[in-house]
Amino acid sequence: MERFELIAPCHFGLEAVLKREILDLGYEISQVEDGRVTFYGDAEAVCRANVFLRTAERILIKAGSFKAVTFDELFEKTKQIPWEHYIPRDGKFWVTKAASVKSKLFSPSDIQSIMKKAMVERLKSCYHISWFEESGASYPVRVFLMKDIVTVGIDTSGVSLHKRGYRQLSSKAPITETLAAALIMLTPWKKDRILVDPFCG
């Protein structure tokens, strides 16, 4: 089975908790950075991570990483990513979110637009078509720039994983399920003990 490099974003400060969760599932850690943990896994790992990781916000398949300081460079290097390996001829694809920190390229809308154009050009040449119906499955792409290093991932989660839960009603200032799970994991609480939340409302 094919092995992917997977990116699991999380709340800042919870990287160690998420790393421990990933190791408990039996996967090899590639890198721990501010706000995300990268690890290796196959297609089954993608499914298991989306279901069982309680502190991850979403799971991305890493499509590529490169340095870009100009929009021309961003276009050309995005075009070099083998998009045909991930997105079929009828796939619906778009850059759903772009974030930039301490980078020369900082306009999210421009980053999204240029990357989409590069993806289209790559897939047009690979599939020998001039128009995409985009009638198939969705392949949302997320991009993050940190100090001019561009990391590109295909989102396998869709809606953020903190919305997986059973919550039927929401109060005015709810704590997300992923953050609540992390807070519990940071305590010495065990499953056989009673848990009381005095601030539950």
PLM segments and residue spans:
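SAM-dependent Rossmann-like transferase core, predominantly class I methyltransferases
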Residues: V152-L186
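A residue-level signal for conserved active-site and pocket-lining positions in enzyme catalytic cores
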Residues: V95, V143, L183
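Glycine-rich helix-loop-beta junction characteristic of Rossmann-like nucleotide cofactor-binding loops
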Residues: W83-I87, P174, I184-D192
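Hydrophobic, well-ordered secondary-structure segments
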Residues: Q112, K116, V120, P140, ...
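C-terminal edge-of-domain segments
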Residues: V141-I154
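Conserved class I S-adenosyl-L-methionine
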Residues: K191-G201
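Non-catalytic nucleic-acid substrate-recognition regions in nucleic-acid-modifying enzymes
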Residues: E2-Y139
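Glycine-rich, histidine-containing beta strand-loop boundary motifs that form or position
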Residues: D34, I154-T156, F199
